[in-house]
From Swiss-Prot:
Pfam families linked: YidD (PF01809)
Membrane-topology descriptor: Peripheral membrane protein
GO cellular component, one term: plasma membrane
Name assigned to this protein: Putative membrane protein insertion efficiency factor
Annotated family: Belongs to the UPF0161 family.
Domain of life per record: Bacteria
Subcellular location: Cell inner membrane
Role: Could be involved in insertion of integral membrane proteins into the membrane.
Main location: membrane
Key word Calcium present: no
Alphabetized UniProt keyword annotations: Cell inner membrane, Cell membrane, Membrane
Length: 117
């Protein structure tokens, strides 16, 4: 049977496509990450030791948890991505515990290292 309204193909993207609140801070952070992915990432090359890559991880962390928490999670992920750091599959946690406060950003280091054990 002919369908006059064909379904649109789902667009492939490398970034998080789930639901998230579109606040000004998140939009600014995601815009900066996307700018990096489009411009600078091509010059640096695919050298990330993790899956998803550090920019994809930071994009998803900001989308899910906001600019402050997501940026700290991404920062610590980039620190761990060095030659003597971690590697492998490390997803963004779906929720943060109550012990993670905005005034203790060093606590976000512990979030990501739990996934590698």
């Amino acid at each position: 049977m002919f369908n006059p309204y064909p379904q649109k193909k789902k667009r492939q993207t490398r970034n998080y496509t789930g639901p998230w609140r579109k606040t000004p801070g998140r939009l600014l952070g995601l815009l900066l990450i996307r700018f990096y992915q489009i411009t600078l990432s091509g010059f640096i090359g695919n050298q990330c030791r993790h899956l998803p890559t550090c920019s994809e991880y930071t994009y998803e962390a900001i989308a899910r948890h906001g600019l402050w928490a997501g940026a700290w999670m991404g920062f610590f992920r980039i620190i761990r991505c060095g030659p003597f750091g971690t590697h492998g599959f490390e997803p963004v946690p779906t929720s943060l515990g109550n012990s993670y406060c905005f005034y203790k950003p060093w606590c976000y280091w512990k979030i990501s290292t739990k996934h590698n054990k």
